[in-house]
Regions:
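Active-site phosphate-binding strand-loop segment of PLP-dependent enzymes
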Residues: 1-79, 84-92
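An acidic, carboxylate-rich microenvironment
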Residues: 4, 31, 91, 149, ...
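Conserved donor-binding loops in enzymes that form glycosidic bonds
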Residues: 22, 144, 192-193
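Short aromatic/hydrophobic-glycine micro-motifs
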Residues: 41, 170-171, 211-212
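Active-site region of PLP-dependent enzymes
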Residues: 50-56, 63-186, 223
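Conserved PLP-binding catalytic core of the aspartate aminotransferase-like
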Residues: 174-229
Length: 229
């Protein structure tokens, strides 16, 4: 709700917006950045579900000050655990490198900003030992090169399923904006007129046919869903 965000941006003393592109859906990033830039709010993008996607031709994660991409087991690239940070801001990347556990060996980092970016940061930044090891990096490199092919394959499957579901009675497809280049690694739809019992029956019937679906909104957290009371 970008109207709500615009109101909050001028009434709340926020410095950073952590934006999660949940389940691969990208909002109007042009308008969001206009709101946040106007209010002096830095944007950090959680691109765990949009790695390989884009908004208006700009890759997901390239709008904000920094982006995080997960490479956990169930993401678009799989190294078991871990992830990738990207930014054009040398201060942010210098801090990330020292935080990751570089000690004073930051100059060995092949993607590091110039040494002067570390001059002040190295004195005030703790070492939390969150670095990626070479084995995970080696596992990810061929997957990164293969990502465009994977995105095209997922999208073909996504659109086939979307076509099959469209016009199904009681089911509402999530329409995607023209500006959004999707990564169709998962698909969502709504059952707005169904009761909880009816939704549970749909899940059970689909599971019996080998189609495993997750219900976001159920009383009990299951699988990828979570709940915090």
């Amino acid at each position: 709700d970008l109207d709500h965000l615009a109101r909050l941006a001028v009434t709340v003393d926020a410095k950073v917006l952590l934006l999660s592109h949940m389940r691969g859906h990208i909002c109007d990033m042009d308008l969001l950045m206009q709101i946040c830039d106007g209010a002096g709010v830095k944007v950090v993008e959680d691109c765990a579900h949009t790695m390989g996607g884009a908004w208006n031709g700009v890759p997901s994660g390239r709008h904000g000050a920094m982006a995080a991409y997960s490479t956990q087991t169930y993401k678009h690239m799989n190294s078991g655990e871990g992830g990738i940070l990207t930014s054009d801001d040398p201060d942010l990347m210098a801090r990330a490198i020292v935080l990751s556990g570089s000690y004073m060996l930051y100059a060995r980092h092949r993607a590091a900003p110039p040494p002067e970016a570390f001059e002040q940061i190295r004195w005030v930044t703790p070492n939390v030992s969150g670095r990626m090891d070479n084995l995970r990096a080696a596992i990810l490199r061929p997957q990164l090169a293969d990502l465009p092919r994977q995105v095209a394959r997922w999208n073909a499957l996504y659109h086939a399923v979307e076509t099959g579901l469209r016009n199904t009675s009681g089911l509402r497809i999530i329409e995607r904006p023209e500006q959004e280049s999707i990564v169709g690694s998962s698909i969502q739809f709504r059952l707005p007129s169904f009761s909880e019992a009816q939704i549970a029956a749909v899940l059970k019937a689909c599971a019996a046919r080998g189609v495993d679906m997750k219900w976001f909104g159920g009383a009990e957290p299951v699988g990828f869903t979570s709940r915090y009371d």
